[in-house]
């Protein structure tokens, strides 16, 4: 868990978000990012009442990409949790501690992505280290890189040997 050292006294998140990092193997391993305004992001979103983090992640994945739970394999050995500060929408001035949970998924077969909530999407070649977005994407990809070095199953899904 990564915490912002500027405000260590706040330890209880008030905003929760959950999503997926999706990989595919085309000619080489690639991961999916969604275009969100002037930045790249993951298919993710806030939890609905009564949802688990995993249920929210799968719902958001389907809503934002058209990918369903049956079209991916979820790595049971990887969950990325990250806390950081956000300014809530709606004109609020007080920052809130957000907890982001990301699951790692692999496409079982190539499928078209149906962008419904983003300007577009892009498959990025897996060639660490990546420098895409310092607050959430880069720490996630660093964690995935460490996981891939340890997990034979995840490496085999990407045909990394």
Provide a role label for each language-model segment.
Residues 22-24, 35, 106-107:
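Residue-level signal for short segments within beta-strands and strand-turn junctions
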Residues 4-7, 149-161:
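A short, highly charged, low-complexity intrinsically disordered segment
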Residues 102, 106, 111-146:
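NUDIX/MutT-family hydrolases
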Residues 67-111:
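Active-site segment of metal-dependent pyrophosphate-handling enzymes
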Residues 1-20, 25-27, 92-93:
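Acidic, metal-coordinating catalytic segment for phosphate/diphosphate chemistry
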Residues 41, 97, 123:
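Short aromatic/basic micro-patch
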Residues 27-70:
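Conserved Nudix-box catalytic region and its N-terminal flanking loop in Nudix hydrolases
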